[in-house]
Each structure stands twice: as C-alpha cells, then as structure tokens.
Amino acid sequence: LRDKSLVQTVPGPGHEPRFRLMDSVRQHAAEQLAASGDEPTAAGRLLSWMLQRLAELDGRFPQMPMMAWLACLRPDVDNLRAAFRVALADPSRAVQAVDLFARSPNFWVRAGFKHDGLLWAQAVPPLAAGPLPGDLRARLDLALAVLGTIGWVLPPAQGLAAAERAALLEKTRQRIDS
C-alpha cells in the first residue's frame, strides 16, 4: 500500500514504523464505513481503545521520562481528538467523555496542544453534572487543576478551585474508607 501511495510511514514510539492513510484514502474509507452502517461500532471501538491507551500511559506518567511519554501518545493525537468527538456526540457516552478528559490534560499541556485542552475543558465538565462512578469526579477536578495551574489553559483561580475540590473529595473518600 505504501508503494501505491495509499499509506505513508511515520515514526512511532521506539522508532518502529506506524502507517497513516493518505487523506483522500481516509475520506473514502470513512464514507464506505458510514455507508456500511458499521460506523457506530467502529467509533465505539476507537473510544474504548483510546481510553485503554490513556489509562496505560497515565499510569506510567510519573515514572517515564517526559519526552518518551509524549512520544508514546503524540502519534495518536488525531485518534484522541476523534475519540473526543465520538464521546461528545453521544449523550450515553458522557462518562467516557469525562474519563477521556480526566486522563489527557498532561498530554495537551506538555505536548503544546493547549487549544485542544481548552476545547475539551469547555465541552466536557457540563457532562459531569450528574453522579460519576468511583474517583472520576476527583480525576476530572485534577484534570481541570492541571489545565489551570500548570498549563495556563484555564484561569489559575479556576484551576486552584478544581484542585481544592479534588482534595476535599479525597479527604472525604479517606474518611469513608477508614
């Protein structure tokens, strides 16, 4: 496919090659997917895969050198954006949208995609008006704190308020657990 100019090779993390569809081929494939009726299934798989990928990388964030961590996720920035669009387009996926957002602020800030961080910071929190499972509300507040205090994407006062809410939720959780 590469020889016929249908895909291009791009370097992936660890210098292994990754393949990317050329724009015209990607557009044609998207049209065919929509026509087949399988688009919702494929979109759900993309969202699940991206959540799994972010969960894996989020867990390695404190231990990994920053540039290596960014190199693992940077090739998937278009997939991450597409996963956000999928999650935001379907109200039944609100919890997944919040989870995706809660796992991604370090990437948006440190990779220089602050506009994306702001876009998702404006779109996602309104989805969290109802109850959220487990520690997701605290992780949402921590994500907003990162964007407001480290990334300067949100006003610092908003980031600080989010950090305070996350700390209060953690204190409450510790009291309940003990």
Where are these regions (language model features)?
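Short, flexible, mixed-charge acidic loops at enzyme active sites
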Residues: 19, 56, 177
